[in-house]
């Protein structure tokens, strides 16, 4: 018989840096999830990823206090800021430019994010990422 789902929880945790301190510990603890067990499992699963990159994770927890989790790829904004060497986007997108990014870099980001995006092909994914870049104040060139 299948386990009864008690709920789901979305968190964004740096790769390889899950620990029981806030905000992870309280979010898991109040739902009855074993915090250390999750931290060990997440850190082991995110070992291959770039240390410190923010990883969106969807945790499904069950009534018997067990859990499963699904890790996604880092957010598009993380990739865009990394590609353009920025700390943050423009405070006034559309008016002040925060920097530029090439279409080749946009394609690389689209290919990396393809499994998480709701896009039929790489071209559609590139258009989505270009929209995110524009909303951050980045100019797409090339």
UniProtKB/Swiss-Prot annotation:
Coiled coil: none annotated. GO terms for molecular function: large ribosomal subunit rRNA binding; structural constituent of ribosome. One of its GO terms (cellular component) is cytosolic large ribosomal subunit. InterPro entries: Ribosomal_uL11, Ribosomal_uL11_bac-typ, Ribosomal_uL11_C, Ribosomal_uL11_C_sf, Ribosomal_uL11_CS, Ribosomal_uL11_N, Ribosomal_uL11_N_sf. One or more lysine residues are methylated. Keywords: Methylation, Ribonucleoprotein, Ribosomal protein, RNA-binding, rRNA-binding. CDD domains: Ribosomal_L11. It comes from the Bacteria. GO terms for biological process: translation. Belongs to the universal ribosomal protein uL11 family. Forms part of the ribosomal stalk which helps the ribosome interact with GTP-bound translation factors. Part of the ribosomal stalk of the 50S ribosomal subunit. Interacts with L10 and the large rRNA to form the base of the stalk. L10 forms an elongated spine to which L12 dimers bind in a sequential fashion forming a multimeric L10(L12)X complex. This is Large ribosomal subunit protein uL11. It comes from Brucella ovis (strain ATCC 25840 / 63/290 / NCTC 10512). The lineage of its organism: Bacteria, Pseudomonadati, Pseudomonadota, Alphaproteobacteria, Hyphomicrobiales. The gene is rplK.
């Amino acid at each position: 018989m299948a386990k009864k789902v008690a709920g789901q929880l979305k968190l964004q945790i740096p790769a390889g840096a899950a620990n029981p301190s806030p905000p992870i510990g309280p979010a898991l603890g109040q739902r009855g999830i074993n915090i250390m067990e999750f931290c060990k499992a997440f850190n082991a699963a995110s070992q291959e990823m770039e240390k410190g990159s923010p990883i969106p994770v969807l945790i499904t927890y069950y009534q018997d206090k067990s859990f499963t989790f699904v890790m996604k790829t880092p957010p598009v904004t993380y990739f865009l800021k990394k590609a353009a060497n920025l700390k943050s986007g423009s405070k006034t997108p559309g008016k002040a430019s925060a920097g530029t990014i090439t279409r080749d870099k946009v394609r690389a980001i689209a290919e990396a994010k393809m499994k998480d995006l709701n896009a039929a092909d790489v071209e559609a994914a590139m258009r989505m990422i270009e929209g995110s870049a524009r909303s951050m104040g980045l100019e797409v060139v090339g």
